[in-house]
Amino acid sequence: MTTTQLGLQEQSLWSRFCCWITSTSNRLYIGWFGVLMIPTLLTATTCFIIAFIAAPPVDIDGIREPIAGSLLYGNNIITAAVVPSSNAIGLHFYPIWEAHSLDEWLYNGGPYQLIVFHFLIGIFCYLGRQWELSYRLGMRPWICVAYSAPVAAATATLLIYSIGQGSFSDGLPLGISGTFNFMLVLQAEHNVLMHPFHMLGVAGVFGGALFAAMHGSLVTSSLIRETTEVESQNQGYKFGQEEETYNIVAAHGYFGRLIFQYASFNNSRALHFFLGAWPVVGIWFAALAVCCFAFNLNGFNFNQSILDAQGRPVSTWADVINRANIGFEVMHERNVHNFPLDLASGDAQMVALNAPAIEG
């Protein structure tokens, strides 16, 4: 009898926990994905803050010349970063217990893997939590579909690129100037600007910003006034009101006359789908571009593709970009002292045909 009562009590406690986790009445929805999201994001955030402030230098190239990335080792908020794991580690999973000591783990950049893996798990769970809450509320699932674009971009940059290049040392440094360094190296090694997927990503991000500004300004300019001239028009809106807050017919007429008729949407649902889909698809392509770079499917090479009647190359902007890429690549590997393949793969030039005679 006692065993039965304990079982019922435990079941009741578990049922209450399940109801609390999945309740949409909480101020913040937790959900089953949140059970994993909260500890992983807290772990990633805590480790990032500590490493950004106080992590010792990391031997990123695996040649015993460590790079200092934290604030306490002389960096400022612009130059500080969590330095990627050492090239000596490569793609090996490197948790704390794999190192002989904590000092060794820090020297080889262990915090980078800890932060990246926990962060990725956290944002995956955040995506799942968005779907879960939409499901509980009876909403359509497109919010998590839209969020999949930045999740795909983060996954491609932090994980797929490192896997394709064969080492986490090629990953994105977690800092401001480290991000810029990563971008320059990515351009040098993969000709990012000449890749069509990157071009689509740029069109998605900048186009999305343009369309958002156009939509916001049109709506703000065609609000239905519910207040006097001396009051803010925002006071005329009541949360949850059934009436339209702006005149879509006026906005449609204005924009159709400003450009041409069919450039303007006459369906509010189609308009907002377009506003959501354009940047999402663009960022999907940007993530695909990074996945291509990971496996060295680089941008187009149009170097010296135009020749004059004598066969001499006529320089284009593609050649200008190529010269910049070579310069970036020469500066990239600080202590390896290797020439970029563009310079090292040419035919050997004879500098002396006859050795001078040495009089003994």
UniProtKB/Swiss-Prot annotation:
Propeptide residue interval(s): 345-360
Disulphide-bonded residues: none
Residues reported to bind pheophytin a: Y126
Record membrane topology: Multi-pass membrane protein
Site feature location: Cleavage: A344, S345
Site (Tyrosine radical intermediate): Y161
Sorted UniProt keywords: Calcium, Chlorophyll, Chromophore, Electron transport, Herbicide resistance, Iron, Magnesium, Manganese, Membrane, Metal-binding, Oxidoreductase, Photosynthesis, Photosystem II, Thylakoid, Transmembrane, Transmembrane helix, Transport
Annotated binding of chlorophyll a ChlzD1, by residue: H118
Stabilizes free radical intermediate, annotated site positions: H190
The keyword Disulfide bond belongs to this UniProt entry's keyword annotation: no
Cross-referenced Gene3D superfamilies: Photosystem II protein D1-like
Residues given in the record as Fe cation binding sites: H215, H272
Name of one Pfam family that matches: Photo_RC
Extra information: Cyanobacteria usually contain more than 2 copies of the psbA gene. 2 of the reaction center chlorophylls (ChlD1 and ChlD2) are entirely coordinated by water.
Name of protein: Photosystem II protein D1 1
Native species: Synechocystis sp. (strain ATCC 27184 / PCC 6803 / Kazusa)
